[in-house]
Curated annotation (Swiss-Prot):
Localisation per UniProt entry: Cytoplasm
Lineage of the species this protein comes from: Bacteria, Pseudomonadati, Pseudomonadota, Gammaproteobacteria, Enterobacterales
Recorded GO CC terms: cytoplasm
Family listed: Belongs to the RecX family.
Record keywords, A-Z: Cytoplasm
Gene for this chain: recX
The UniProt record lists the keyword Cytoplasm: yes
Name of the protein described by the UniProt record: Regulatory protein RecX
Top-rank lineage group of the source organism: Bacteria
Natural source organism: Escherichia fergusonii (strain ATCC 35469 / DSM 13698 / CCUG 18766 / IAM 14443 / JCM 21226 / LMG 7866 / NBRC 102419 / NCTC 12128 / CDC 0568-73)
Coiled coil regions, renumbered to chain: none
Function, as annotated: Modulates RecA activity.
Amino acid sequence: MTESTSRRPAYARLLDRAVRILAVRDHSEQELRRKLAAPIMGKNGPEEIDATVEDYERVIAWCHEHGYLDDSRFVARFIASRSRKGYGPARIRQELNQKGISREATEKAMRECDIDWCALARDQATRKYGEPLPTVFSEKVKIQRFLLYRGYLMEDIQDIWRNFAD
């Protein structure tokens, strides 16, 4: 940390840090609070910012006011991103919970997203096990276990074979 930055008020340093963090990607409010509270890595090792709780609250409020921090936008983008990577609704809900997003906000966003989880589960299964999907019980169990690990619901997994039989 240079001498000029160490003279800046803690609020200004926190605000600068928050904007830099949020410029990279969206974060939940809890993630941003955790990152702001972490020590800054300087040339001489970790350096603490002598900021008060009020400074942190002002920075968070400023980020909300100016549109840098929006949990609903974060949730929508997170769901879209993780579903594109092949994860199911149960896994996405768990990850959002770990990121400090309320259950209500998560459920609202999951209802609003337009994702066909059954089709996504089928795509993941065919990507991993090939087309056509096996009909032997032991192979079905492997696919089921894989999809459950990826976060798909049992009803979506069972629909794969129901739709396959049609």
